[in-house]
């Protein structure tokens, strides 16, 4: 009996072991081999990356905007730069012909798109449909700065930004608004008190830290990772604009207060000068932009913008600043070709260069070239009859965009420091008598030109 029991037990153990072995073989063949095969197939390029959170969010967003006829275009600097580097590949790719996600699957927290607000016909309906599709959306609004000069309309609110989150990825929709002279503007993304600061990592947003101004881009449609999107026709021009896009508004409230204290000059002569000065500024901007030379409003023209949002009627000229490293040898010829003859040339490229051109109606264009030192910047001046040199010192500054007399132009971002350097703490008080050699608080003597150089550094026409 004992022997039989041992044989039975042995047989049962053998049978059980065999069954378990067969199960392992079956499991390996039908499960593990399938998984490994799928992984191998994926690694060989059969639709790699199209299950990524980023691509799925972008695809759903494009479906939403396409179905609702919302004309968005891609402005994400990272993706645009990648597209630009691989543009031949993108240009020759048709929808559905790709096997690998190259652009939209790049790890990141946001993808930035934009639209021009005047082309958006169904804003509220779009917002509701987006949430029905699974997006969690946040809308940022603020007062329309274009109406700040009009008391009765200055409280009107406009949409500035949408952030729509799907799973772990968010779409940042930047709303561009038209401004004068055909450029686009977006507002500051300022979070109100009730907004959840943990909704998305706001600090990683590439647009909205401050208002921005951009040239209106020409758009083209391309297929990127199997998705049809609009992008700027010159992607790198847009990308290069981003870090230099900061925009500051004219101070309309302070300008109104200024004119309550000091009545505006609306005489025929003042109106005529402002008209001529505006036309001269437009012509100068067109000429310098064509040359690719950046400039900013300087001296009295900058003071007029900052203090009264207008041209100072008794200034009698237009003042611009240019960094000396941006000087081009064909500047003089370009202005002459534009109908502005050279009135005088002082200094030289290496030291204290200054150009003056004669506009119509006796309005003069003065261009001051700025030189950078370790802890300050300066521009020079020259007295023609004596050869004396002067230097005007400014704290270091960067450039921002603004709007002035219906134009998009640069001004120093650190405007108050710039104005106070040139005009002192009493810059709010109009001064009609001004001695360029003594009045500015930042002027100092800078030697005298050797007589042997006068023919080069003092040229009057």
Swiss-Prot record:
Question: Lumenal side of the membrane: what ranges?
Answer: 29-461
The biological pathway it contributes to is: Protein modification; protein glycosylation
Q: Where is this region: Required and sufficient for interaction with POMGNT1?
A: 6-27
Q: Which InterPro entries match?
A: FKTN-rel (IPR009644), FKTN_N (IPR045587), LicD/FKTN/FKRP_NTP_transf (IPR007074)
Q: Name one GO cellular component term.
A: nucleus
Record's keyword terms, sorted: Cytoplasm, Glycoprotein, Golgi apparatus, Membrane, Nucleus, Signal-anchor, Transferase, Transmembrane, Transmembrane helix
Domain of life of the organism encoding this protein: Eukaryota
Q: One Pfam family name from the record?
A: LicD
Q: Which residues lie on this side of the membrane: Cytoplasmic?
A: 1-7
Broadest EC class assigned to this enzyme: transferase
Localization (cell): Golgi apparatus membrane; Cytoplasm; Nucleus
Q: What is its EC number?
A: 2.7.8.-
What catalytic activity is recorded?
3-O-[beta-D-GalNAc-(1->3)-beta-D-GlcNAc-(1->4)-(O-6-P-alpha-D-Man)]-Thr-[protein] + CDP-L-ribitol = 3-O-[Rib-ol-P-3-beta-D-GalNAc-(1->3)-beta-D-GlcNAc-(1->4)-(O-6-P-alpha-D-Man)]-Thr-[protein] + CMP + H(+)
Q: Which residues of this chain are annotated as glycosylation sites?
A: 92
Q: In which tissues is it expressed?
A: Expressed in the retina (at protein level).
In what way does this protein cross or attach to the membrane? Single-pass type II membrane protein
Per UniProt, subunit arrangement is: Forms a complex composed of FKTN/fukutin, FKRP and RXYLT1/TMEM5. Interacts (via transmembrane domain) with POMGNT1; the interaction is direct and is required for normal POMGNT1 location in Golgi membranes.
Please explain the role this protein plays, according to its UniProt record. Catalyzes the transfer of CDP-ribitol to the distal N-acetylgalactosamine of the phosphorylated O-mannosyl trisaccharide (N-acetylgalactosamine-beta-3-N-acetylglucosamine-beta-4-(phosphate-6-)mannose), a carbohydrate structure present in alpha-dystroglycan (DAG1). This constitutes the first step in the formation of the ribitol 5-phosphate tandem repeat which links the phosphorylated O-mannosyl trisaccharide to the ligand binding moiety composed of repeats of 3-xylosyl-alpha-1,3-glucuronic acid-beta-1.
Q: Which family does it belong to?
A: Belongs to the LicD transferase family.
Q: What name does this protein carry? A: Ribitol-5-phosphate transferase FKTN
Q: What gene is this protein a product of?
A: FKTN
């Amino acid at each position: 009996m004992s022997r039989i029991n041992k044989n039975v037990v042995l047989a049962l153990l053998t049978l059980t072991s065999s069954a378990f072995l067969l199960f392992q073989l079956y499991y390996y063949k039908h499960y593990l081999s399938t998984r490994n095969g799928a992984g191998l197939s994926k690694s060989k390029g059969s639709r790699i990356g199209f299950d990524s959170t980023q691509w799925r969010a972008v695809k759903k967003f494009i479906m939403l905007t396409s179905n609702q006829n919302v004309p968005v275009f891609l402005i994400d600097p990272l993706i645009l730069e990648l597209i630009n580097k691989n543009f031949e590949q993108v240009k020759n790719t048709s929808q559905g012909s790709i096997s690998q996600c190259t652009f939209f699957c790049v790890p990141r927290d946001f993808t930035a798109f934009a639209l021009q607000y005047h082309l958006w016909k169904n804003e509220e309906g779009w917002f509701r449909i987006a949430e029905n599709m699974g997006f969690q959306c946040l809308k940022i609004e603020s007062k329309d700065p274009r109406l700040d000069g009009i008391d009765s309309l200055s409280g009107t609110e406009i949409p500035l930004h949408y952030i729509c989150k799907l799973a772990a990825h968010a779409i940042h929709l930047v709303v561009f608004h038209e401004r004068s002279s055909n450029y686009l503007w977006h507002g500051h993304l300022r979070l109100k008190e009730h907004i959840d600061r943990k909704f998305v990592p706001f600090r990683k947003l590439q647009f909205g830290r401050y208002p921005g101004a951009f040239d209106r881009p020409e758009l083209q449609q391309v297929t990127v990772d199997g998705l049809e999107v609009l992008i700027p026709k010159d992607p790198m021009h847009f990308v290069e604009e981003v870090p230099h896009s900061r925009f500051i508004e004219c101070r309309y409230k302070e300008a109104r207060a200024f004119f309550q204290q000091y009545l505006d000059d609306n005489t025929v002569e003042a109106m005529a000068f402002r008209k001529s000065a505006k036309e001269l500024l437009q012509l100068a901007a067109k000429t310098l932009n064509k040359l690719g030379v950046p400039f900013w409003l300087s001296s009295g023209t900058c003071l007029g913008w900052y203090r009264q949002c207008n041209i100072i009627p008794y200034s009698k000229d237009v003042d611009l600043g240019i960094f000396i490293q941006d000087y081009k040898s064909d500047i003089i010829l370009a202005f002459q070709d534009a109908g502005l003859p050279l009135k005088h040339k002082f200094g030289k490229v290496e030291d204290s260069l200054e150009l003056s051109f004669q506009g119509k109606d006796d309005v003069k264009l003065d261009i001051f070239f700025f030189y950078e030192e370790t802890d300050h910047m300066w521009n020079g001046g020259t007295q023609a009859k004596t050869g004396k040199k002067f230097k005007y010192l400014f704290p270091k500054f960067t450039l921002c965009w603004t709007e002035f007399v219906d134009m998009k132009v640069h001004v120093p971002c650190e405007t108050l420091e710039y104005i106070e350097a040139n005009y002192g703490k009493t810059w709010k008080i109009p001064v009609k008598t001004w001695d360029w050699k003594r009045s500015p608080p930042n002027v100092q003597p800078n030697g005298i030109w050797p007589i042997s150089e006068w023919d080069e550094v003092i040229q009057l026409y």
